[in-house]
From Swiss-Prot:
Keywords: Phosphoprotein, Sensory transduction, Vision. One of its GO terms (cellular component) is cytoplasm. Directly interacts with light-activated rhodopsin thereby activating the phosphorylation of metarhodopsin. Inhibits the dephosphorylation of metarhodopsin. GO terms for molecular function: G protein-coupled receptor binding. It comes from the Eukaryota. Gene3D superfamilies: 2.60.40.640, 2.60.40.840. This is Phosrestin-1.
Length: 401
């Protein structure tokens, strides 16, 4: 069986410089982060003694673009890495197997490069916009770009520059915690004896995207009130650290009267199942995603993970967390009883059964989507499959080069 290597490519508008990347997603393993490794192919006749530079940049947008007035900006762009690719500054650079294949296939005009993310760099997150909002979405985005210039500080002309948006993501740790998240609350009532107790227990601490979240609810009614109905939510909590803003959105919910009313002296034990999905929140403003909703493999943003000994308060960028919220309606005079149980929503780790199942599903979808796609072709000599990045070109691009 011959295994093909998928490689993503994108060229400048004038076609003189082309990026090749072996992947679009780069994983933070906590003790190290996958390097950004690829190859740049340049037409030597186009350079005319100029140089090719490449950058790894992050753009952190924490406010709406339409609110930027009087020179006030609600975004920060940081250049994380910058390197001269042509002529190559480091001729002894160690290449990955994919880079070796590409250089062998593409010839002497192919130049490898490798960038490294700084430690503790935030994960890619995009906050979903409203339907009529045409500005850039809030979130953290990583871009790798290459351009032709006499020096690295020269103006970057759009005609001779190519940029690609990549994602930095986190996977679930290889070992799961043994503790089952739980919460116990009780409520008494004025001018009435007794209490209603609510206990919620989850069957695990870490859930994977696309999986069921199981919450077992135990209700003991030792009061004179009755529970009318039960509401179950999965809440996504978002913190934008730059402006210290926090908000919460439900990403899955259900309401039921099954087993209700729970009358005085009665008990109820029931397990509820919810599946938080990005596809069920397409039109909801402010939902945090790990990319743009138009992407075929987009998920809800994963929970923010930090190294042992640190708290999420030390994290930068956009901090994401999740919880299961249970509400009991005790009538007009009784009010509500509410409790939250936190959990983590993450990508399955490589090599896990869940990850293999997820990869198999994505591969099937990819095969179907690319059967009739012109931007997809295979080179049998080196078992390389090339796929074009979506071309996002500005209509008023600078034509100077």
């Amino acid at each position: 069986m011959v295994v093909s290597v998928k490689v993503f490519k994108k060229a400048t508008p004038n076609g003189k410089v082309t990026f090749y990347l072996g992947r679009r997603h780069f994983i933070d393993h906590f003790d190290y982060i996958d390097p950004v490794d690829g190859v740049i192919v340049v037409d030597p006749d186009y350079l005319k003694n100029r140089k090719v530079f490449a950058q790894l940049a992050t753009i952190y947008r924490y406010g709406r673009e339409e609110d930027e007035v009087m020179g006030v900006k609600f975004s920060k762009e940081l250049i994380l890495c910058r390197e001269q690719i042509v002529p190559m500054g480091n001729s002894n650079m160690e290449m990955t197997p994919t880079q070796e294949k590409l250089v062998r296939k593409l010839g002497s005009n192919a130049h490898p490069f490798t960038f490294h993310f700084p430690p503790n760099s935030p994960s890619s997150v995009t906050l979903q916009q409203e339907g009529d909002d045409l500005g850039k979405p809030l979130g953290v985005e990583y871009t790798i770009r290459a351009y032709v210039a006499d020096s690295e500080d020269d103006r970057q002309h759009k005609r001779s520059m190519v940029s690609l948006v990549i994602k930095k993501l986190q996977y679930a740790p290889p070992t799961r915690g043994q503790r089952l998240p739980s919460s116990l609350v009780s409520k008494g009532f004025t001018f009435s004896n007794g209490k209603i107790s609510l206990e919620v227990t989850l069957d695990r601490e870490i859930y994977y995207h696309g999986g069921k979240v199981a919450a077992t609810v135990q209700i003991n009614n030792n009061s004179k009130k009755a529970v009318k109905n039960i509401k179950v939510f999965i809440i996504q909590h978002t913190e934008i650290t730059m402006v210290n803003a926090q908000f919460s959105k439900h990403v899955a919910q259900l309401e039921t009267k099954e087993g209700c009313p729970i009358t005085p002296g009665a008990n109820l034990s029931k397990t509820f199942y919810l599946i938080p999905l990005a596809s069920n929140n397409k039109d909801r403003h402010g939902i945090a995603l790990d990319g743009h909703l138009k992407d075929e493999d987009v998920n809800l943003a994963s929970s923010t993970m930090v190294q042992d000994g640190k708290s999420t308060g030390d994290a930068c960028g956009i901090v994401i967390s999740y919880s299961v919220r249970i509400k009991l309606n005790c009538g007009t005079l009784g009010g509500e009883i509410q409790t939250d149980v936190p959990f983590k929503l993450l990508q399955p780790a490589p090599g896990s059964v869940e990850k293999k199942r997820s990869n198999a599903m994505k591969k099937m979808k990819s095969i179907e989507q690319h059967r009739n796609t012109k931007g997809y072709y295979q080179d049998d000599d080196d078992n390389i499959v090339f796929e074009d990045f979506a071309k996002m070109r500005n209509n008023n691009a600078d034509v100077m080069d």
